[in-house]
Amino acid sequence: MVSPAKPVVCIVTPGTKSANNGNWRTAARWAEMLRDRFKVIVQSEWDGTHCDAMIALHARRSATSIARFAANRASPALAVVLTGTDLYRDLPRHLEVPRSLDAARRIVVLQEEALRSLQARWRRKARVVLQSATPLRTVRKTRIALHCVAVGHLRPEKDPRTLFAAMRLIPHELPITLRHIGAPLDAALARQAKALAKQDSRYRYSGALSHGLTRAAIQSAHLLVHPSAIEGGANVISEAVMSGTAIVASRIAGNIGLLGRSYPGYFEAGDASGLARRLVQAWKDVNYRKRLQKACTARKAALSPAGERRALRNLLAEMLS
């Protein structure tokens, strides 16, 4: 007996494997999760290949593929995934974003708080897919220093300037270090990172690393520091949680939607002194570190691969029914 052909799903992402950015890693992870039930194609722009459903990451940058797929289809099996720049910058500025949302059968957001940014007509067809990470064992960490890691390409949305300023505010006698991982996409920010590394041995700029090396760095750190100004729902948050690494993060919707409103590790976005205080507190107060760790551990079930896979399958079942 011949098995029925698997439905074909095209995942469109403006990211590329060589760029090693969040869009690409999301697309690659989702493709792997879906391949047991679907034939999955990943493209940077849809080339017209037959597909039964499309999942398009980035409403603005994938707008051409979205419009072409939706054309001449009364009810396309089309899901548009909203990134942080879509939600918190481009939605009110670029007509392509609302057009993409209107064309979609389903809208995907990557954390619960994002629903608040959608008009009622879009919220009705929105679904939340929390990004996951493979669990890693928690490793023993030194007690004689506080080693922090920040992961994010150097660009304004990730707000590395707040990191730089915070490190300058932390007293030099405190054994607090920061390793910064991310490609130098913004030349001015890259110059600042390299200058700080020369001036302050506690700060180390590693540039872009492979995903495996980045996860190892997160796993070995005491804290992930995540100062973004705009975030749709950063997968690095999930990677830290699933590695047993606590988090200090900016109080923005993209982080609150993953960690919860009562998470004890927030500082106000752009507040370097607030970040510095959090890091000093984490070094000096072992009970505070335990509170952070407990709060992160409580998020493991929500950020597990099983939950993400289930949400994706439910999404496609709705569109293809």
What residue ranges belong to the model's regions?
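Aromatic "clamp/platform" in nucleotide-sugar-dependent glycosyltransferases that forms part
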Residues: A229
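Nucleotide-activated donor-binding/catalytic signature segment of Leloir-type glycosyltransferases, i.e.
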Residues: R191-L209
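Short hydrophobic beta-strand element within catalytic cores of glycosyltransferases
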Residues: A246-A249
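A short, active-site helix/loop in glycosyltransferases that binds the activated sugar's phosphate group
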Residues: D102-A126, A133-L136
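Conserved donor-binding/catalytic core segment of Leloir-type glycosyltransferases
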Residues: R140-K158, L163-L169, L178-I181
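Conserved acidic donor-binding segment of nucleotide-sugar-dependent glycosyltransferases
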Residues: R261-A272, Q281-V286
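Short alpha-helical donor nucleotide-sugar binding micro-motif in glycosyltransferases
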Residues: L101, A208-L209, A216-A221
